[in-house]
């Protein structure tokens, strides 16, 4: 159940790194919701696989290369909280950007139903009812 959800989240990140959108969205509910933190350039809630995929692809536009690496995954019922390392290199630059964010996935019937993104990893853990 929850361990299966953890493995689904891992496979989504692996597919993201390959830019394999079919695989990345295969285990997501057709009505999946992606909620980004307030204050960002495209903050808000995106609904449905296509809208979520469009958001992700637009987010990637300024970068020549980018990868995500789940450093820690915590299962809590039908949720998976993630401490995620994001590495990116902007186009026309040799600068490397590395940040850590939090993500909270919610599942229903083996499908990712929602993803909430947090600028601070500990906020995702708090939202899941977990503490470090």
Where are these regions (language model features)?
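C-terminal and inter-domain tail/linker signature
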Residues: 1-132
């Amino acid at each position: 159940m929850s361990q299966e959800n953890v493995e689904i989240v891992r496979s989504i990140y692996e597919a993201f790194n390959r830019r394999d959108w079919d695989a990345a969205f295969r285990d997501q509910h057709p009505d999946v919701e992606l909620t980004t933190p307030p204050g960002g350039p495209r903050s808000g809630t995106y609904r449905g696989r296509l809208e979520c995929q469009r958001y992700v692809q637009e987010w990637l536009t300024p970068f020549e290369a980018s990868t995500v690496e789940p450093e820690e995954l915590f299962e809590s019922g039908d949720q998976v909280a993630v401490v995620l390392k994001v590495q990116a290199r902007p186009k026309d630059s040799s600068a490397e950007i590395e940040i850590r964010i939090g993500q909270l996935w919610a599942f229903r019937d083996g499908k990712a139903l929602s993803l909430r993104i947090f600028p601070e990893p500990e906020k995702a853990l708090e939202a899941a009812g977990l503490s470090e």
